Amino acid sequence: MEKKKILLVEDDQFARELYEEVLKDAGFEVNSAVDGLDGLAKIKIGGYDLILLDVMMPKMDGLDVLRSLINEPPAVKNGPIVLLTNLTNDPVIDTAYGLNAKGHLVKSDITPGELVDHVKKYTDESQLTESSPIADSSSS
């Protein structure tokens, strides 16, 4: 079975290396970006099953990345974009959902095991949506 491709866009080196290691150990292929500009360039190439996007980053924040994708979609379709943030109940999160983010994970609250569970859930859901003709008719 082909490994799911994850793009991790995270400027904090410790968090980025931790998430990379945890996800690789769980059987995912992980590419990383160190800031929003680097992340946007990789997202535009496309082909990722899931994108984990930090909100607060230098050069270009997560919301600016999401806005750019609305104006210039990727060459190859990507799976869902899930925010990585330490913000909870914040207007920034609502704004991100309005810009097509599919979820958010609070970095300070999530354990490595929970991260893997969430990533599996998002990658499985996106595969179901793409490959299942039932998904369209049953969405409520």
Please describe what each predicted stretch is.
Residues A41, L63-V76:
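Short amphipathic alpha-helix used as the core "switch/output" element in two-component signaling
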Residues E17-D25:
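Charged docking surfaces used in two-component/phosphorelay signaling
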Residues S32-L50:
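Acidic, metal-coordinating helix/loop segments flanking the phosphotransfer/catalytic sites
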Residues E10:
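Conserved acidic carboxylate
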Residues D54, T85:
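Active-site residues of response regulator receiver
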Residues K4, D35-D38, D61-R67:
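Acidic catalytic/metal-coordinating carboxylates
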Residues R16, P58-D61:
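The feature encodes the CheY-like receiver
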